[in-house]
Amino acid sequence: MYVAGFAPDAGESIGQIGEWLPSPALGNVEWDSDGYVWIKQDKFHESFCQDLPTDEALVMAVTQKAPVGSIFGETISDPAWKKKPTWYQVSRDDRMIPPVTERRMAERMKPRRTIELDSSHASLASQPGAIVDLIVEAAASIS
């Protein structure tokens, strides 16, 4: 299950995928002295979850879990999506991963189903019902 997420191929890194079409919110991201990557708190709402209420975005901004920046350069050796059934959700209004990039990853994965939602990167929070429906569909098909 991929929810507006990266899906690298063998020998490919997240950073390489990010070069296909840079994120519109790239300028709102910063690295800290420990090598973690954060979305600037004052830019979080407009960058990550513009379809959520301001108060929810603020909570997400101050509790965000920053990835270590080195993950962007690590290559994948054996992507699970080549061996396992997959489903992909594209966020049409994503500012973190461009929707064009999400579609390109989904197309090459040949998922059992791809859905598109009018949502930000935070589709799990803004469209939980649609995400649950996709998960239930996926679970039912492999049970």
Predicted regions and their residues:
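Short, proline-enriched alpha-helix->beta-strand connector loops that line the catalytic pocket
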Residues: 81-86, 109-112
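Flexible "cap/lid" loop of the alpha/beta hydrolase fold
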Residues: 2-41, 68-71
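Helix-loop "lid/cap" segments that line or gate small-molecule binding pockets
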Residues: 42-51
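Catalytic active-site module of serine/aspartate enzymes centered on a nucleophile-bearing elbow/loop
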Residues: 110-143
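Short alpha-helix in the alpha/beta-hydrolase fold that links the catalytic acid
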Residues: 74, 99-105
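Conserved strand-to-loop "acid loop" that flanks and positions the catalytic carboxylate
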Residues: 85-94, 118
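Conserved alpha/beta-hydrolase "acid-adjacent" motif
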Residues: 95-101, 127
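Active-site nucleophile elbow and catalytic-triad environment of alpha/beta-hydrolase enzymes
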Residues: 62-80
